[in-house]
Amino acid sequence: MAVGTTTGELRELTDEELTDKLRESKEELFNLRFQMATGQLANNRRLRVVRQEIARLYTVLRERELGLAAGPGGEDS
């Protein structure tokens, strides 16, 4: 997942793309935590960035679920 993906960019994605990105981010977070536990992680900041990215993804998905935001193209998903 790209570093610095904004919420606006995430809102332009479809639900399937969002769930794919969420899965990828969770896998990356798992790998980063494993590296941290074994002392191989050089960049601790990446953990925080990935957690924030996951939170943004959940926020966009929840907005759509509640009907607060439309899907890509202005249509409700």
Curated annotation (Swiss-Prot):
Signal peptide: none annotated. Keywords: Ribonucleoprotein, Ribosomal protein. The keyword Ribonucleoprotein applies. One of its GO terms (cellular component) is cytosolic large ribosomal subunit. One of its GO terms (biological process) is translation. The keyword Metal-binding does not apply. One of its GO terms (molecular function) is structural constituent of ribosome. PANTHER family: 60S RIBOSOMAL PROTEIN L35/50S RIBOSOMAL PROTEIN L29, LARGE RIBOSOMAL SUBUNIT PROTEIN UL29C. NCBIfam families: L29. HAMAP family: Ribosomal_uL29. Belongs to the universal ribosomal protein uL29 family. This is Large ribosomal subunit protein uL29.
